[in-house]
Regions:
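Catalytic active-site module of serine/aspartate enzymes centered on a nucleophile-bearing elbow/loop
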Residues: 2-4, 252-281
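Short alpha-helix in the alpha/beta-hydrolase fold that links the catalytic acid
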Residues: 64, 219, 233-242, 253
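Catalytic nucleophile-loop/oxyanion-hole region of alpha/beta-hydrolase
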Residues: 85-112, 117
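Gly/Ala-rich beta-loop-alpha elbow adjacent to hydrolase catalytic centers
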Residues: 120-124, 128
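Active-site nucleophile loop of the alpha/beta-hydrolase fold
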Residues: 142-153
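Short beta-strand/loop motif that positions the catalytic acidic residue
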Residues: 217, 223-225, 229
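Acidic catalytic loop of the alpha/beta-hydrolase fold
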Residues: 228-232, 260
């Protein structure tokens, strides 16, 4: 517990430092939106490490975290580096920075609870699968709307913008770099309104790195997807499901027309499915 307290205080310090360094008036959200947090459940037998998605913040998964806490689980929600601050911060981060954030979160929850289930939303789902493939002690994994195949305009645009920036660099131009595209999020009180193109490339790198590891993943797994997700292709999460090496795996398709299915109407059904999965394993 002392280890957990120390690591949590370090994570909070790092966030406060990043927040003040990258704060942009009128663009950064209130500091509490990005704060990592621990939900103390009744039991310390099973803990959950729960990760937010890209361009979001821990607040995005708070409803699920509170629900899991209410049915008895300890839950730790880390902040992914570059998030909860400003898009300019995120533009400078690699997916390895996000992996490091998740690994520190795992160190925290595993120092509190005997068994740990890891899970996440969107890019956080990819990070949870990556952790479960690397760390054999993980008890199970759930992945909601994992971004194996992106269909959002800005991700299709990313390679072209990347190429444009390289051409501009080669020309030694001080001309305009196209570093961000506009983001119109479902939850503007949480998510960034500018999407750094470099960040989209990092999601693709993360998922490319993850794919060959999936056949080695042999813990119970739950893959959750929205049927008409406007951001990630459902066939991408089905591909993840098929590639998973574990025999104990479930694929749940929910009839939503949005990406963020952990918030808003009907999200309680998704929370319940995740709770049932954790209880079962």
């Amino acid at each position: 517990k002392k280890v957990a307290d120390y690591l949590i205080s370090k994570a909070v310090e790092e966030y406060e430092s990043d927040y003040h360094r990258y704060y942009i008036q009128g663009e950064s959200k209130p500091i509490d939106v990005g704060m990592p947090f621990l939900v103390k459940g009744k039991s310390k037998n099973v803990g959950v490490l729960l990760s937010q998605g890209y361009m979001a913040a821990p607040r995005e998964v708070e409803n699920l975290a509170r629900y899991l806490g209410s049915i008895g689980f300890c839950v730790y929600v880390p902040r992914l580096k570059g998030h909860g601050t400003s898009p300019d911060d995120l533009a400078n981060r690699s997916y390895q920075d996000w992996v490091a954030s998740i690994d520190r979160g795992y160190a925290i929850i595993s120092s509190i609870c005997k068994r740990v289930v890891v899970g996440g939303f969107s890019t956080g789902a990819g990070l949870a699968l990556d952790l479960a493939a690397r760390v054999k002690e993980v008890a199970g994994v759930f992945a909601v709307a994992a971004p194996m195949t992106l269909k959002d305009f800005s991700s299709k645009f990313a390679p072209a913008v990347d190429m444009w920036n390289r051409i501009m660099d080669k020309a030694y131009s001080v001309g305009p770099k196209m570093e961000f595209v506009e983001n119109k999020p479902e939850n503007p009180h949480i998510n960034y309104l500018r999407n750094p193109i470099s960040g989209v490339r990092e999601i693709e790198r993360l998922m490319d790195d993850l794919e060959p590891k999936l056949p080695d993943l042999d813990v119970p797994a739950l893959i959750v997807q929205s049927r008409r997700d406007p951001v990630v292709e459902p066939k991408g999460s089905l591909k993840i499901f098929k590639l998973l090496g574990t025999e104990d795996k479930e694929y749940r398709l929910f009839n939503f027309d949005r990406h963020g299915i952990l918030l808003g109407d009907g999200s309680q059904r998704v929370h319940k499915a995740i709770g049932e999965f954790i209880n079962r394993i």
